[in-house]
Amino acid sequence: MNAPVTAPPVNADNEKLAQRCEKIAESATAAIEWLDVAGEMVRDEGPAMARDFRRETLRARKLAAAARRPMCVSVFGPSQQGKSYLIASLARKGDALTMIRFGEEVRDFVADINPDGGKESTGLVTRFTIRPVIGLPGMPVACRMLSETDIIKIMANAFMEDFDRDTVTALEPKQIEEVMARMRAKAARDPVDRLTEDDVYDLFEYFERYFRNHPSHIALKPAYWREMETLAPRLAIPDRTELFGLLWNLTPTMTRVAVKLITALSQLGFPDEAFCPMAALEPKRSSIIDVETMATLGEDSTDRVPVATRMGQRADLERAVLTAIVAELQLQLADKPFDFFDHTDLLDFPGARTRGKESAQNAEREAAQNIFMLFRRGKVAYLYQRYLAEQELTSMLLCLKHSNQEVATVPFMVNDWIVSTHGATAEARKAHATTLFLVFTMFDVEFAQKAGQQDDSVERWSTRIETTLTQYLGKSPEHTWVHEWVPGQAFNNTYWLRNPAVRDEG
């Protein structure tokens, strides 16, 4: 079979950058500790200063981790936009098959791994890399895992985005205080596992950024959050999940499923990565890469998959649960398709989806019947937010097809990435090379002659550009990048993508 691809050496400059970021994090942590003993000097400004230093600590740690990871090209867009063809073209060498290495075994990605059918079918990020993916004996399938706070963010995202916020009745202070009082009585003296105060503060920062004006977040006053930072790490998983359940208005089914998923992570020691046998991907109809495998998430199942970590923890997890808690599937390409893989990985994101607008008055009934769909939509949306926060997305191939776009959140998601990587203004963006590539997919349809219409290609293609760029991506007044990417120039890094194997039979 094909010889293993040799990965490039670790970049020394990136390691130096990571170490500098770690020193910044250490200094910020030391500043927080100093504030604890310098109360008389800082007086009322102390809490605000501590929050600022904690924010910088988290940011520096994320930057350090990002510096050690390879650059990434992300393929992103709404569901059903033709991303699969682009991924297939980029992940194979010429006309060869896309072959994936699992230890000593090599498999065909399309035939053996990728879910069948034309529907949007993944609920995790797929990483294609030429770097060695080193598994465990008998467990060559490598996965990056969600964290406990990721689960909380996903569940709350599902509640806050899939239920109409105008129908949300915020919890009363008395209800919140009742929960807090019960948890105070249950709290241990010291933290019980890996959850830290910084983790809880990171939760607060997430909701401040994305859901600042949501009734469920507004109801949790800053004073509650400050107490939760010290209280949650001292609670057992069911209790602290109930505490965080305040974010989804204590909807019972959502809390129950969150406990189930976090408990699975705890059985593995809350790992950053875990490993499975090939059975996790077989048969294809129940592979963990197929989002439909999560359909039994709210039920008990005997279909289990063994999972292990490098630290020696092992557990047999329900297949639906494993599918839910995996963030990323890491696939090592047997052959290098293009030279950019020497320094860059290719990330295939699940397609963004239209969010539901159910009445929050029916939240428990909806969750009991459709927890799979709620968690699915929340996870797909959150994965993008996680990779954005972790500074992983160096470049983006944004795929949009010819029909009207219905996923209203995509323009805002793209704008967040642009602000983070290129800048919020045209003046700021001119200092950076453009790494956003707008790909008009399914261009084959533009060659089809429609009955009764003149063949005016210029008008037809201009209309498509206008519809996609101005009316969709640039509709919001906040999204000025469409009209002025750099001073005096609109965004123009656009490409047409067609499949040359498709012929116009008209």
Q: What are the functions of these language-model segments?
A:
Residues 70-74, 89-113, 129, 162, ...:
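Conserved GTPase G-domain substructure that encodes guanine base recognition and part of the catalytic core
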Residues 82-86:
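Conserved glycine(s) of the Walker
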Residues 93-102, 108-109, 144-148, 341-379:
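Switch II (G3) loop of P-loop NTPases
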Residues 133, 351, 499-501:
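Residues that form or immediately flank small-molecule/cofactor binding pockets and catalytic motifs
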Residues 338-339, 431:
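Short hydrophobic "helix-edge" motifs at membrane interfaces and signal-peptide entry regions
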